[in-house]
């Protein structure tokens, strides 16, 4: 017979009491009322915050956007096909954030900062909120350093500075993405981190951009954030903020960053879809009332930081697509008013073979001229005026048959200036090469050539200067001014190359 010893039992009970931990855990939960179209209506979740992440029973994450009296409207970060009516939802107490680190360079990720390039996980020890406040006035300084795009038309007449927001706007198929990718290629060796955000693009288009960057060695300093056309609207809406958070991480570490949003029209459409499904009242073009704030809070995060914060910068190049050149539509006017200028790409110019198809007349950079180097200012000062006068004359000349000699000369000069602005895709030029090109055109050295010979001559002239007069580039890069010595070298090179070129042309004819 087993004897029960009271002291042993009391000892066990005492130990159990000592081990007992009175931890009270309150979990904010709710119940799914209805789900569909990427939206869930939740009953409960009484203390949820606006923008808080919520977790469904089967693992899907959502963001609480609509806080109503009887229920909460949640947008899903996934298809939500496994979510059932009546299942439970719990609030996480966290606002959307992503991991950030140097390891993201060279990778392709989605809006949740998860890699989608099949090259394994990305290690990161820090994290940043996807939505963080923009730097205040005291935290900034005015734009003063240039960000070269490698495109003559932009760097000479619509200059961009580090920390600026410059809109690229135009119809579909006018080369907007090409301008952006050329700018990324031109940052090679400039110590600039680039972030390319693809929103609602075709997967094949994104793959093509990534391929171009890899071939040219530009992926080493680039992060691609991609949410393609088949992604849920929530993720397309979040992608630009994810890109901005990654760029900010580098900006606050005293680095220079360039971020491209391709394109914000698609983000606005995704946000419109979410808002209408959440039953928010529609406004102009069925967009919700806060669509301006959607873009302003994103683009205000681009800045040139003050010297106290390390002078890092984040330059934003948002892209907006217009419908048959209508710049007065809702989203284009909104983004134009937020940014520091716009580069307008014209379908007519593109179809006429002028590429990049930049309409210089209505493109503008509001703060970039302060960042332009002195050498470029000296050379390109009268280029915009001459092109504007040429465009006016050309329109007038269509109605007149007999033109005086001066007008004919001005038209001939204008045609050659327009020719020198043409560039092949993925062939950005250095500032020194741009100065050579513009000086040759504005000083009449191309007037004696046929229009068809202009580009060939300029390519040969740039190569000739690189090999025979390397000191020209040294003067420009060290002094940042177009000195008398540099001008003498350039004039000599133009005359020597012109003689060679005309001889070659004569030999080819014979």
UniProtKB/Swiss-Prot annotation:
Superkingdom of this protein's organism: Eukaryota
E.C. numbers: 7.1.2.2
Main location group: plastid
Catalytic reaction list: ATP + H2O + 4 H(+)(in) = ADP + phosphate + 5 H(+)(out)
Binding-site positions, ATP: 170-177
Record text on subunit structure and interactions: F-type ATPases have 2 components, CF(1) - the catalytic core - and CF(0) - the membrane proton channel. CF(1) has five subunits: alpha(3), beta(3), gamma(1), delta(1), epsilon(1). CF(0) has four main subunits: a, b, b' and c.
Protein name as annotated: ATP synthase subunit alpha, chloroplastic
Organism: Glycine max (Soybean)
Gene name per UniProt: atpA
